[in-house]
């Protein structure tokens, strides 16, 4: 502390006296008294910076020539950083769990889940992740219980975190009930999620005017990405497809594809909507059961001139109109062909040596967002291998190599079916042959591949090649395939509790057994023999097939084939009895009466029996 302020020019006698007293008190160590004098002096002369400097020196000596303010600030910062690091560790564990779930690595996910629960406790994000884990293992009831135990009311809300927990809660319930086969209930939950999402978007605003732009100023950037409408529409579309409402599903998926146009699965689902909407409204096609109304169209005339008019088996595209372009998004077979072409183009280049079948899957939203994408199984697939490349398929989880190959099989099967429906037999044959050349193919798709190839060949007058495809020995398996996720789950779980039943059933449109599939092959083989006028072989195939299945499972096309064979054999009365009883009857050989019947015009272009099965793979739900 300097005393030169006493000699400063312009100071009054009072100021000099106070300054002298302050200096004397400082020299004697009376720092408190010195500070009082300096305060009084500063009131007298507020513009002198030397007074402020002397006060600082006095305070420094008063504290023992040390200062603790920096240490206190450092300690506070250290505590703050420690809390931030702990929060970051918790977030990192959550992100690792989500990454393992996307990679379908349940073993690593199980270990990481424990770290999440230790660091985050029973917070909503941690419980959502654990529920997701149990959901992937097939423990659906436990997953629902964990979701219900989460206290979503404590979550800060979408305006602070960018995550609408209520929306994710309803979406996750919808995913779980989808996996349990309760599609109507799952659709209800998805609609609730859409309502919550719309409410959140209304809170944030759309930014279309100046007021909304000002409103965004206090909202974090992540909150602007809280809209999950298109993911939820994707989920709703898949649920509607399973319920049997393809047109409503088509509308939902068309909105989703505007955002996720690079997802090949989504294009396949759109094609399946078109196929289902155009399959026909007859009950026998939908349920696989014969109907007399599907055979007899009308009865005309009376008495001796009474005639039975048989129904035409040609299918018509009731959705598509010739006046509009096929590129217009309408649920038509023409648009289905475009969707399937897009799906094939979006798949990576085929690698035959390591191709693996695919399992489609439905992703599950976690604490970071609502991810969806319902997918289905079509063929068997293997376990995850190290080095697998993942193909992006937003909004669902990335596709592994075996999933890509299985997806390719499904697209090829649908493409062959659509090409046949459109009369493009060369393209149908091309797709069917590509399907049959896939390295790993499920029994059901192999069965369909042979049927579609045979039908295309018959239309191209390649009956001999078609007969080779229709050999019943080609059918040795009609399984829909085992998902890679189910295999992973089995290997990860070890001796843990068994997976509960999901409630899903094998779809009716697939053959229930190998014998049923071979019977369908024989029905079609009989049609092929008919075209070569080998009626005895056709009759043997027909009755052999009829003996392999229940009477109610015989398709109406097979009954019409039996009528045609009896007419060719001259057994008019037996043909009438087959129509009246709507079932095949033992053939009776006539006497030596000549066979004067010509081949009816309506049977000159007899097609193989249209398989009851459909290539659309959405009828079976499969997990990742």
UniProtKB/Swiss-Prot annotation:
Keywords linked to the UniProt accession: Cytoplasm, Nucleus, RNA-mediated gene silencing, Transcription, Transcription regulation, Translation regulation
Record bears the keyword DNA damage: no
Biased composition (Polar residues): 602-624
SMART domains named among the record's database cross-references: TPR (SM00028)
BP GO terms, sorted: mRNA catabolic process; negative regulation of translation; regulatory ncRNA-mediated gene silencing
Protein family per UniProt: Belongs to the CNOT10 family.
PANTHER family: CCR4-NOT TRANSCRIPTION COMPLEX SUBUNIT 10 (PTHR12979:SF5)
Name by which UniProt lists this protein: CCR4-NOT transcription complex subunit 10
